[in-house]
């Protein structure tokens, strides 16, 4: 089919498919990583390497997504772990088509009370490991015709929150890192993008949020609800597929509109 000016019309739904491709999901055992693994398989991925530091979690999600799932256990915040993951993943099908990096955690400490250990831990788990993974997988993808990298950032990298300084700084650094990845690796056919979630009601958050906290977070969003892990998985699939074939170096905010909201004391 063509348009009136003879421009070919693509099959848009097929652009969201990732048939036959091999992906690595770092942090696949819980929440957003778990849902992203399902999204990739539903879109046709041949293999999804499910990475977690916990052997039971890795095995569980690999079994859950079916024959495409491959469990991998290790610590990707070390150079040795990142290199081993890249080598093991490449050995499965001879190439890696996409990386989705969802590794990261936050500690709540004020700047005046923060220890060196907490600051270093946040930088390592939210930023430094992304350097290790993107370097290891970038080297592989640059030799095999390209691929996609998707990193989970945070709205904390755009806007500040009390007790969140090290986490926010690491996530802001991650978004800057993604931009440089995009311009350095674009010539190899590698696209790098990030997703910045707002408050997502993951199983981990469900376990700690009170009803009052849930209502407060939902009410703060223009959409009047909290996000779900499927919302983040959908964004990760978009960036991992040809639906975003001409998008690189970008961060997509998925927060229900919170980041767009000026806290003006007027209700409609």
Name every feature range the model reports, one short phrase each.
Residues 110-111, 115-123, 217:
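Substrate-binding pocket helix/loop in short-chain dehydrogenase/reductase
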Residues 134, 191, 225-254, 259:
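C-terminal substrate-recognition "lid" of short-chain dehydrogenase/reductases
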């Amino acid at each position: 089919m063509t348009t009136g000016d003879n421009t070919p019309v693509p099959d848009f739904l097929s652009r969201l498919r990732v048939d036959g491709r091999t992906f690595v999901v770092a942090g696949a055992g819980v929440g957003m990583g778990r849902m992203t693994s399902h999204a990739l398989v539903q879109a046709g991925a041949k293999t999804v390497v499910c990475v977690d530091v916990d052997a039971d979690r890795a095995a569980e999600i690999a079994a859950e997504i079916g024959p495409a799932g491959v469990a991998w256990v290790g610590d990707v915040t070390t150079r040795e772990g990142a290199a081993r993951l890249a080598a093991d993943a490449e050995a499965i099908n001879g190439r890696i088509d996409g990386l989705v990096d969802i590794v990261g955690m936050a500690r709540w400490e004020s700047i005046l009370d923060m220890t060196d250990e907490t600051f270093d831990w946040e930088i390592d788990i939210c930023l430094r490991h992304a350097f290790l993974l993107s370097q290891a997988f970038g080297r592989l993808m640059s030799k095999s015709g390209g691929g996609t990298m998707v990193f989970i950032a945070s709205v904390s990298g755009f806007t500040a929150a009390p007790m969140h300084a090290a986490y926010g700084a690491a996530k802001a650094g991650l978004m800057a890192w993604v931009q440089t990845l995009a311009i350095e690796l674009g010539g190899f056919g590698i696209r790098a993008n990030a997703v910045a979630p707002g408050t997502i009601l993951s199983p981990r958050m469900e376990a700690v949020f009170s009803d009052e906290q849930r209502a407060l977070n939902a009410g703060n969003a223009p959409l009047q609800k909290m996000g779900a892990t499927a919302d983040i998985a959908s964004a990760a699939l978009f960036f991992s597929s040809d639906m975003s074939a001409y998008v690189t170096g970008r961060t997509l905010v998925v927060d229900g509109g919170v980041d767009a909201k000026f806290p003006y004391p007027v209700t409609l």
